[in-house]
Amino acid sequence: MRFGVEFGASVPQAQRITDRANVQSYAARLSRVTWHPISVSGAKANFHVLFMGEDDRAQMLTRVQQIVPNINPASMQILRDIPQSIHCLVIAFSATGNSSDYRESIALIRAEHPELLRKSCIHEELAQGLGLANDSPRARPSIFNDDDEFSLLTTHDEMLLRILYDPRLRPGMSLRQAHPIIRQIAEELTGGRS
């Protein structure tokens, strides 16, 4: 996984330095958690992190079409009409014919928000773009639910990501195939506690 960090023209230089450093630090943490190579690199990025302000909307739409030339109209419509109440989002694009195998992701983080909110968006959207996309009210304590109780990646979230990236699991496995493996990994991570 290679994160590419890009900024809209309206984003001040000092903010760019802070946001890039937050993505770099978080990428290192995600790599440690998942035991998967994750880095920040402009070259050949497959996960694009766009910090764009409202004034950068046209630039953002153009850039998204460059990244994913065949983006479906529904995804473009979401980006074109994103309501101001949405602070950030991630859209993941799967390999052809395999919806469980992400090949490209784009996270959009509104640049005009305060630093802590942008950092929270980095944590949530980059983790979701790694494959834990569904928000669930049963995921607690977690950033993977919509109650906004937790803003930064929790130990529980780290365990979920570690399970997801365990080499014993493969993209496209059925729940029936994956369930006993997931249970075993969870027991290993928690020392057998349930």
Please annotate each region the language model reported.
Residues 1-2, 25, 33-35, 43-46, ...:
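Extracytoplasmic
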Residues 13-14, 58-59, 116-120:
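Extracytoplasmic/secreted cell-surface and envelope-processing proteins
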Residues 15-38:
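Zn2+-dependent metallopeptidase catalytic core
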Residues 61-66:
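A contiguous, low-structure linker/loop signature
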Residues 120-133:
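Active-site recognition of the HExxH zinc-binding catalytic motif
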